[in-house]
């Protein structure tokens, strides 16, 4: 997962750039709502692209590209919120190996 570390570092560096010259700086400058709007947009694009993976199109490359876009914007969000990607990876690592329903029950508190 070296790419995650490298991407995180690059995003942090670009936050300091001129928003007129850096897409990351522009998103950061426009604030949380703009970043969330982009994540929503990218999520929708993933859903639509995934529908294209079924016959007859079978376009897996498109959905893969859209997922990369979504991950990128999630990385921008993490940086904006001052959350390290490693924190997310640790949570995933802790969940690995447990059945999904068992793991979910552990983190779902009754109301």
Region spans (language model):
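Flexible "arm" and connector segments at domain edges
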Residues: 1-67, 71-111
């Amino acid at each position: 997962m070296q790419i995650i570390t490298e991407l995180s570092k690059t995003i942090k560096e670009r936050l300091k750039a001129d928003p007129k010259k850096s897409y990351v700086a522009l998103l950061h400058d426009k604030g949380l709502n703009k970043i969330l709007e982009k994540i929503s947009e990218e999520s929708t694009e993933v859903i639509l692209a995934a529908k294209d993976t079924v016959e007859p199109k079978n376009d897996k490359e498109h959905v893969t590209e859209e997922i990369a876009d979504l991950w990128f914007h999630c990385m921008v969000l993490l940086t904006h919120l001052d959350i390290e990607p490693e924190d997310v990876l640790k949570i995933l690592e802790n969940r690995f190996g447990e059945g999904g329903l068992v793991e979910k029950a552990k983190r779902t508190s009754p109301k």
